[in-house]
Amino acid sequence: VVAVASADPGTSLHTLVQTRLEASGVEHPVTAVLLNFRAYDTLLEIGVLVVAGITGMSLSRAGARAEPELRSTNTLLHALARWFVPLMLLLAAWLLWAGSHRPGGAFQAGAVLAAAGVMMRLTGLPTAWIAPGPMLRLGLSAGFSVFLLVAAVGALTGRAFLAYPPLLSGPLILVIETLLTLSIGMILLGLYVAAAQRDGADE
């Protein structure tokens, strides 16, 4: 923000990002902006998403996440799921890794992870982590909590809020994005399950 305010009015934002890209810890300008230069925006967005996920799931019926009516008995879907779910998990991992140097990142990887979870729910594959308990609470909060912890440590050690140590920018961003991927995937899957239950209850 300070760099933009003090820059020549004729200098574009793209140029400013490119001149500081090497210090960001990643090679892709969008990831650099979202996880470094404007990381507090992303932190707030994740906080809103966590609150939305907790609220949505708290409105679903108690114990309903294990109800069998959300599952399909379609044998073709069940057979395809055993092939597609591992491929989707690999795709999510690739999108997460690719985000440092090309389009991708935690949000896209989390969406694919949630889609894999939806397919698992529909075919009856185990999804115990979406049931109420410590695993669900940890998954929902892990990304935001670690993001906030990194921000707080930076501020307490004399740097700006969410300013990473230069030598640790890349590894810290990778850790944050990995945990954000898991949290985003769990939140989206939880909202899908909660919405399906409410639709069934309204009929």
Where in this protein do the model-derived segments appear?
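Alpha-helical transmembrane segments of multi-pass membrane proteins predominantly involved
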Residues: 1-203
